[in-house]
Regions:
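A detector for short, charged/polar N-terminal pre-domain segments
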Residues: 1-11
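Short basic helix-loop element that most often maps to the first helix and adjoining turn
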Residues: 14-29, 58
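Short alpha-helical DNA-recognition segment
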Residues: 24-43
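Short, conserved catalytic or interaction motifs in soluble domains
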Residues: 46
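DNA major-groove recognition helix of helix-turn-helix/homeodomain DNA-binding modules
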Residues: 54-69
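Short, charged recognition helix plus adjacent turn
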Residues: 71-84
Protein backbone atom coordinates (compact mmCIF):
# COMPACT_ATOMS: atom_id res chain seq x y z
CA UNK A 1 0.00 0.00 0.00
CA UNK A 2 1.42 3.37 -0.99
CA UNK A 3 0.54 6.37 1.10
CA UNK A 4 0.62 9.74 -0.62
CA UNK A 5 1.35 12.94 1.22
CA UNK A 6 -2.17 14.24 0.62
CA UNK A 7 -3.83 11.04 1.88
CA UNK A 8 -1.52 11.05 4.90
CA UNK A 9 -2.37 14.68 5.72
CA UNK A 10 -6.08 13.99 5.28
CA UNK A 11 -5.96 10.94 7.54
CA UNK A 12 -4.14 12.84 10.30
CA UNK A 13 -6.55 15.76 9.91
CA UNK A 14 -9.58 13.49 10.21
CA UNK A 15 -8.14 12.02 13.41
CA UNK A 16 -7.59 15.52 14.83
CA UNK A 17 -11.18 16.46 14.02
CA UNK A 18 -12.62 13.22 15.40
CA UNK A 19 -10.83 13.54 18.73
CA UNK A 20 -11.53 17.28 18.97
CA UNK A 21 -15.26 16.71 18.48
CA UNK A 22 -15.28 13.81 20.97
CA UNK A 23 -13.90 16.24 23.53
CA UNK A 24 -16.41 18.91 22.54
CA UNK A 25 -13.72 21.42 21.62
CA UNK A 26 -14.14 24.01 18.90
CA UNK A 27 -11.40 24.65 16.37
CA UNK A 28 -10.78 27.96 18.13
CA UNK A 29 -10.41 26.32 21.53
CA UNK A 30 -7.88 23.79 20.26
CA UNK A 31 -6.05 26.50 18.34
CA UNK A 32 -5.82 28.67 21.47
CA UNK A 33 -4.30 25.76 23.40
CA UNK A 34 -1.74 25.29 20.62
CA UNK A 35 -1.16 29.03 20.20
CA UNK A 36 -2.07 28.95 16.50
CA UNK A 37 -5.03 30.25 14.53
CA UNK A 38 -8.29 28.34 14.15
CA UNK A 39 -7.72 28.61 10.40
CA UNK A 40 -4.59 26.50 10.78
CA UNK A 41 -6.54 23.82 12.69
CA UNK A 42 -9.13 23.98 9.92
CA UNK A 43 -6.42 23.42 7.28
CA UNK A 44 -4.98 20.48 9.23
CA UNK A 45 -8.42 18.90 9.56
CA UNK A 46 -9.13 19.26 5.84
CA UNK A 47 -5.72 17.85 4.92
CA UNK A 48 -4.80 21.09 3.15
CA UNK A 49 -1.69 21.50 5.34
CA UNK A 50 0.51 18.92 6.96
CA UNK A 51 1.59 19.05 10.59
CA UNK A 52 5.17 19.06 11.76
CA UNK A 53 6.21 16.41 14.28
CA UNK A 54 6.24 19.11 16.96
CA UNK A 55 2.71 20.23 16.08
CA UNK A 56 1.38 16.66 16.06
CA UNK A 57 2.90 16.12 19.53
CA UNK A 58 1.44 19.40 20.76
CA UNK A 59 -2.04 18.58 19.44
CA UNK A 60 -1.83 15.04 20.84
CA UNK A 61 -0.96 16.42 24.28
CA UNK A 62 -3.91 18.82 24.24
CA UNK A 63 -6.28 16.12 22.99
CA UNK A 64 -4.89 13.71 25.61
CA UNK A 65 -3.88 11.00 23.14
CA UNK A 66 -0.60 9.34 22.29
CA UNK A 67 0.92 10.50 19.00
CA UNK A 68 0.52 6.92 17.75
CA UNK A 69 -3.23 7.63 17.60
CA UNK A 70 -2.62 9.68 14.45
CA UNK A 71 -0.67 6.92 12.71
CA UNK A 72 -2.51 3.72 13.64
CA UNK A 73 -3.97 3.30 10.14
CA UNK A 74 -0.55 2.95 8.53
CA UNK A 75 0.45 -0.59 7.57
CA UNK A 76 3.65 -1.98 9.02
CA UNK A 77 6.02 -2.83 6.21
CA UNK A 78 8.74 -5.32 7.00
CA UNK A 79 11.86 -5.07 4.89
CA UNK A 80 13.13 -8.46 3.85
CA UNK A 81 16.80 -9.26 4.08
CA UNK A 82 18.03 -9.80 0.54
CA UNK A 83 20.65 -12.30 1.75
CA UNK A 84 18.03 -14.78 3.03
Amino acid sequence: MTTTLSSFNLSVGQKIRQKRLEQKLTQSQLADKCKITFQQIQKYEKGANGCSAFRIKQIADHLKVNVIYFFDYLPIVKEENQND
